Amino acid sequence: MTGVVIKIRSLLKSLVKRLPHSLLMRIYHRWHVRECRAAANTAAQQLGIPRLDTFDISTLKRTDTLFVLGSGPSINRISPARWKGIASYDTAGFNFWPFHPFVPRMYFFESIPYESQEANISAEMYSVVKRMLIDRAAAYARVTKIITDVGVHRDTQLIFDLPSQWLPNLYVAYTVPVIARTETELTIGIRYLKKRRLFTKARRFWDLFKYCGSLSSIISVGVRMGYRRIVLCGIDMGKQEYFFQDRELFPRTASLEFGPKEHRHYTAEGQQWMVPMQVVVSVLMREVLEPAGVELYLENSASALAPLVPVVPTAIFAC
């Protein structure tokens, strides 16, 4: 973390008890746009990686349904027949997804720092992610790849250390957070960004909403691309378990462990400045998806988001 970020966060913390949230939120947003957006743009220019808004992302949309592929263990219970159905729709994987043999149409991943206790990133995780990208570069050469969180960590981050094989069809996105401690504050923040067209359908954009985890970004991308249905697969969040830890199906990666498996996934746990993903999804459904006429579903009920998010009708997998 840079000295500038530390100073700004210290200042914001000192203002928390003195400023109303609506004003604090605006100060934080303007600072983030000025500092982190500029840093993301500078990194893109320095490395010669195009920004996402140079690409007409609407050209990727073939269907009205987007399947989002997460890394929870329920992925391993999806039948071959269902995978055949999923393959007939547009798909977006994120973060650890390349460990899976199914290659999606889009792939989102974070420009993680080399090591950061605050970001829950260890040096081991960084090395594992980089090796994963190298091993899967050929399979993902024609996949549209979007790297996020570029403006947060500055020099000590993945975008400056990407394998050259990973550069084809790679784009930089700027992730826009809000500052919120409660559902009410999050609602205010999302309404603020909504007025700034962060959830408006568009052919070109590079500003992506993100709060609590990558799932919020991909849901917002689905809305902006004009999908009518978004189906979440492997978004379990019950424990810190991943599909690639199955010893029978994934013997090469089964020993990987980035946190105690018995603990709930960190995105499902509330923190001082981060409400749980269940609340984030609830607010997004109410404030963004429902007004836009977008339906959100789960592939199965093995998720901390159930029963808030319904299970998709089985007929969708018929092909």
Language-model-detected regions and their locations in the chain:
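Metal-ion/cofactor- or nucleotide/acyl-coenzyme-handling active-site neighborhoods
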Residues: 3-319
